[in-house]
Amino acid sequence: MRLVILDNYDLASEWAAKYICNRIIQFKPGQDRYFTLGLPTGSTPLGCYKKLIEYHKNGHLSFKYVKTFNMDEYVGLPRNHPESYHSYMWNNFFKHIDIDPNNAHILDGNAADLQAECDAFENKIKEAGGIDLFVGGIGPDGHIAFNEPGSSLVSRTRLKTLAMDTILANAKYFDGDLSKVPTMALTVGVGTVMDAREVMILITGAHKAFALYKAIEEGVNHMWTVSAFQQHPRTIFVCDEDATLELRVKTVKYFKGLMHVHNKLVDPLFSMKDGN
């Protein structure tokens, strides 16, 4: 497990974007060899998406041979609703890059048979050869995707009832009106993300500090679903200083002492212009 600590949100976002960029380019994707990327929504990854868009606009990175699978989607919210995760992804990322819309997979929260939709999503991931890099964020209660506290750590894509803490946190996106906030969602399972060949979790802000502490300094616990990634062979937690406030000083010092190693993963930043 790696813990990458940057000074602030912008630097953490840039490090994560550089890592994604380098992983895609090193993979050498092509017509018969797609890189498969798992993606989150929420406020945390916005900075990362902006940097990836910048790399694309500058000609360093193409998503032509990338397939994406999003973590979750609300149930019952129209696809074109401004707060649906379809809208989020297209407005904040997909419409700014060269990805084929047929390769951008997002769960349909309005499907006639929700369980069949979840099963089909799992099958699409298998057909794509599994996920090379799953990027995620977490809530203050340590949930990954919509795997709320108490979720099985071997769970698969399914329908979930949202915890009140999550509904309250999401109310800001619905004019503060709790009655407008969806109470159910389709989500990948913890096991779905664990199956990825690599996982990168973005954690920023003091309000996520206790969750980061639970994720790396205490044991694996289904009440803090992000802690499951202690058992993944290739996990990277990318955080800012504020997110480390609950960690032991020696933990922070240890991982900061490895930054010269971690930075070799993103420096130099590769470019498709160079023929990589």
Swiss-Prot record:
Enzyme active site: D72 (proton acceptor), D141 (for ring-opening step), H143 (proton acceptor), E148 (for ring-opening step)
Catalytic activity of the protein: alpha-D-glucosamine 6-phosphate + H2O = beta-D-fructose 6-phosphate + NH4(+)
Biological process, per Gene Ontology: carbohydrate metabolic process; glucosamine catabolic process; N-acetylglucosamine catabolic process; N-acetylneuraminate catabolic process; UDP-N-acetylglucosamine biosynthetic process
Positions in coiled-coil regions: 105-130
Known tissue expression: Ubiquitous, with highest expression detected in testis, ovary, placenta, and heart.
SUPFAM superfamilies per the UniProt record, alphabetical: NagB/RpiA/CoA transferase-like (SSF100950)
Gene3D superfamilies: 3.40.50.1360
Localization annotation: Cytoplasm
Residue positions where Phosphothreonine is found in the record: T161
Annotated family: Belongs to the glucosamine/galactosamine-6-phosphate isomerase family.
Self-association and partners: Homohexamer.
Protein name per the record: Glucosamine-6-phosphate deaminase 2
Lineage: Eukaryota, Metazoa, Chordata, Craniata, Vertebrata
Gene: GNPDA2
